[in-house]
Amino acid sequence: MIKSFRDKETKKIYHGYRSLKLDQSMQRVAYRKLKMLNNAYDLKDLLAPPSNRLEKLKGGLEGLHSIRINDQYRICFRWYNQDAYAVEIVDYH
């Protein structure tokens, strides 16, 4: 379950509101993936579909995980006790 958001734009998308951060088609995908993250009981639940490409991040982002929205955008989050914290949509380019 999502417990906190790192930014207000990601929270808006999760609650079904329009954001200027992403175009409309990208927001639909982000919304679907955020709902998937919210429903995940275990990190392994995010392994499907394979297009999520669940990753444990390294370096300066150690402690974070991500799933892909597309090649450019990812949803990054901290996973602790079966919950997601500091959820945010990040532009990787």
Residue ranges of each PLM-predicted region?
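Generic structural signal for well-ordered secondary structure
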Residues: 3, 27-30, 46-50, 70
